[in-house]
């Protein structure tokens, strides 16, 4: 788990200059970014933000990448108008900031988004992908909502509790070897719990030499050594959705 002195040392990394292919919409009480699939296959993916919010271009880039593979994607504002974390902010107040943005208390928003995807986008199969804060949300949601056909949790903090294994549908977990937010002992705990108790398909992948945020907050060309891992993780994400949706 993250330490108290630096409770969630998430570096915003390389903020992409990216305009996006989708559009912003209002879904009941939530703003959201939606990208329609070029092929109407009746499949949709909810992409859940990290602590830097739903408007981060990097997250929208990933949503558009997923959309290009046959899925309508939606990036809702799960902070519901509250400010995202400022990367230059005082990390000592981060725990207090986080208390009003609980990744396990987004059921009202999920209900609204599911209704929108089914009624307005004609989605018959729905999956979820989330990063950091959103990765934690994905883990929680995959234990609660059986209608999510597949989930991908990307460096979501692992909660040390007895029910972390009770997944309802196939879930992929992506971690980074050198993640100071999520130590490898937490990944080992999750691995042990799932191996002992999980009754659905799952996979845990830890990427060598990588750090928190590597999948969606690094430029593809930022380092020749990192690029293969970024590409592989993104490919794994798409392959998991394709396999189970």
From Swiss-Prot:
Keywords: Acetylation, Cytoplasm, Hydrolase, Phosphoprotein
Activity control note: Strongly inhibited by p-chloromercuribenzoate (PCMB). Partially inhibited by bis-p-nitrophenylphosphate (BNPP). Not inhibited by DFP, PMSF, eserine or EDTA.
GO cellular component, one term: extracellular exosome
Entry GO MF terms: hydrolase activity
Modified residues (N-acetylalanine): 2
Active site location: 132, 179, 212
Role according to the record: Cysteine hydrolase. Can convert the prodrug olmesartan medoxomil into its pharmacologically active metabolite olmerstatan, an angiotensin receptor blocker, in liver and intestine. May also activate beta-lactam antibiotics faropenem medoxomil and lenampicillin.
Record's protein name: Carboxymethylenebutenolidase homolog
Organism taxonomic ancestry: Eukaryota, Metazoa, Chordata, Craniata, Vertebrata
């Amino acid at each position: 788990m993250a330490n108290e002195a630096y409770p969630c040392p998430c570096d915003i990394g390389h903020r992409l200059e990216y305009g996006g292919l989708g559009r912003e919409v209002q879904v009941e009480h939530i703003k959201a970014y939606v990208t329609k699939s070029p092929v109407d296959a009746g499949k949709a993916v909810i992409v859940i933000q990290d602590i830097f919010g739903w408007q981060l271009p990097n997250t929208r880039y990933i949503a558009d990448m997923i959309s290009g593979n046959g899925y309508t994607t939606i990036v809702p504002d799960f902070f519901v108008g509250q400010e995202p974390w400022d990367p230059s902010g005082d990390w000592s107040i981060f725990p207090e900031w986080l208390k009003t943005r609980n990744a396990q208390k987004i059921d009202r928003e999920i209900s609204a988004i599911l209704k929108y995807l089914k009624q307005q986008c004609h989605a018959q199969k729905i999956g979820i992908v989330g990063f950091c804060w959103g990765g934690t949300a994905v883990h929680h949601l995959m234990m609660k909502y059986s209608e999510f056909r597949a989930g991908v949790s990307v460096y979501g903090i692992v909660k040390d509790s007895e029910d972390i294994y009770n997944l309802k549908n196939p879930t992929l977990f992506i971690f980074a070897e050198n993640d100071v937010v999520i130590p490898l002992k937490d990944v080992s705990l999750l691995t042990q719990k799932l191996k002992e108790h999980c009754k659905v398909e799952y996979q845990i992948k830890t990427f060598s030499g990588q750090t928190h945020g590597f999948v969606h907050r690094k430029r593809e060309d930022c380092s020749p050594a990192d690029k293969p891992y970024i590409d592989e993780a993104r490919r794994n994400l798409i392959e998991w959705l394709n396999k189970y949706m």
